[in-house]
């Protein structure tokens, strides 16, 4: 079995539960605005938000364009006029409080950092990601954190990964594994950068033929087998 030395972890829905953080932040934002948040609006927000972030991954939009237009675009569909940038500021404050861990994340990361060099690779807003990682207790386990906002590039762009590789001492692509939940950002990005990839896929989403991960897992504990190490927590 291949021996890895460096592990690159995505954040949202890989080690931190972004779905829970997002749901809470949306509820608090709409309560603040005195606007009823319906299930239809939640679903439409996800559609709009995912589409905008996909455009960001493809280099078609900036991060500021994504976050400052998503709420105004959503509310316009329901007859509301809104200041998208102002709503984003309020939403961001609520979102930063969401640091619920994915099941098994703390034990896994605290174990792995004893044997591997761990790094964060994430698309998003720097202040938000740093705060959530600190509040979750995971921050000290990582040697460095690479947020797209700080690098000037984003996953899956090769320039993003080049930026990361240049800042990892004695970096070796052959001995590096990236773990993430996004086929387009993490898995495709890892492949373009010459890395082995591990797709975190708890919901058993269908794959696409052109993006085949090296490994696929349903829960984080499965990484112990891939990395050929003992799960000291369960023993």
Swiss-Prot record:
GO terms for biological process: pyrimidine ribonucleotide catabolic process. It is an enzyme of class 3 (hydrolase). GO terms for molecular function: 5'-nucleotidase activity. Gene3D superfamilies: HAD superfamily/HAD-like (3.40.50.1000), Putative phosphatase, domain 2 (1.10.150.240). It holds the Pfam family Hydrolase. Its EC number is 3.-.-.-. The active site is at residue 10. InterPro entries: HAD-like_sf, HAD-SF_hydro_IA, HAD-SF_hydro_IA_YjjG/PynA, HAD_sf, PGP-like_dom2, Pyrimidine_5'-ntase_YjjG. Keywords: Hydrolase. Belongs to the HAD-like hydrolase superfamily. YjjG family. This is Putative HAD-hydrolase YfnB. It comes from Bacillus subtilis (strain 168). The gene is yfnB.
């Amino acid at each position: 079995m291949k021996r890895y030395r460096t592990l690159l972890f995505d954040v949202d829905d890989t080690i931190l539960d972004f779905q829970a953080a997002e749901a809470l932040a949306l509820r608090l934002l709409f309560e603040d605005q005195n606007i009823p948040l319906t299930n239809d609006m939640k679903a439409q927000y996800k559609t709009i938000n995912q589409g905008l972030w996909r455009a960001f991954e493809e280099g078609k939009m900036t991060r500021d364009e994504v976050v400052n237009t998503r709420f105004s675009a959503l509310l316009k569909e329901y007859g509301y006029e809104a200041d998208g940038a102002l709503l984003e500021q309020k939403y961001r404050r609520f979102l930063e409080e969401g640091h619920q861990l994915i099941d098994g994340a703390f034990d896994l990361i605290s174990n792995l950092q004893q044997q591997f060099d761990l790094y964060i690779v994430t698309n998003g807003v720097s202040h938000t990601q740093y705060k959530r990682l600190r509040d979750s207790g995971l921050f000290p386990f990582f040697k460095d954190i690479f947020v797209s906002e700080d690098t000037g590039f984003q996953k899956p762009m090769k320039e993003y990964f080049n930026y990361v590789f240049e800042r990892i001492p004695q970096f070796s692509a052959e001995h590096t594994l990236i773990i993430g939940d996004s086929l387009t950002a993490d898995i495709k990005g890892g492949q373009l950068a010459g890395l082995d990839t591990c797709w975190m896929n708890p919901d058993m989403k269908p794959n696409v033929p052109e993006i085949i991960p090296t490994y696929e897992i349903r829960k984080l504990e499965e990484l112990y087998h891939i990395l050929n190490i003992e799960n000291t927590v369960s023993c």
